[in-house]
């Protein structure tokens, strides 16, 4: 499994997602609360998956996805009301609320 970065504006949300992934044997490389932190975390990595919420204090998930280096995918976890009907491009969307198994299998699929 590649590098996993968990990124949510609320630290508790990030911890919860991180704990689910770790509990299922998926190592998390970094936990971030802003888009800038995510981009800084990707500097030393060649590829990976960013598991993200919809909005940060400094940017949206779409802006973050546009700035991610090649080799990185973004998995958005948000209510479908946030993104349904929009063309999300290369962003993979997982509707919240979700089942733990859905999160784990989606991360492994990417």
Could you describe each region identified by the protein language model?
Residues 7-8:
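Conserved acidic carboxylate
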Residues 41-42, 82-91:
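Short loop/helix-cap segments at secondary-structure boundaries that form the rim of catalytic
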Residues 98-108:
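C-terminal output helix
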Residues 11-30:
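Two-component/phosphorelay signaling modules centered on CheY-like receiver
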Residues 31-49:
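Acidic, metal-coordinating helix/loop segments flanking the phosphotransfer/catalytic sites
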Residues 14, 35, 48-69, 80-82:
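Conserved phosphotransfer microenvironments
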Residues 71-84, 94:
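A short, hydrophobic beta-strand element within the central beta-sheet of small alpha/beta folds
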């Amino acid at each position: 499994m590649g590098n996993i970065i968990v990124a949510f504006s609320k630290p508790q949300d990030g911890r919860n997602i991180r704990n689910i992934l770790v509990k299922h044997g998926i190592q998390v490389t970094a936990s971030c609360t802003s888009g800038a932190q995510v981009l800084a975390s990707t500097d030393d990595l060649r590829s990976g998956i960013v598991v993200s919420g919809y909005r940060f204090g400094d940017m949206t998930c779409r802006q973050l996805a546009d700035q991610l280096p090649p080799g990185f995918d973004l998995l958005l976890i948000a209510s479908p009301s946030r993104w349904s009907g929009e063309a999300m491009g290369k962003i993979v969307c997982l509707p919240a609320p979700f089942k733990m198994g859905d999160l784990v299998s989606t991360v492994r699929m990417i």
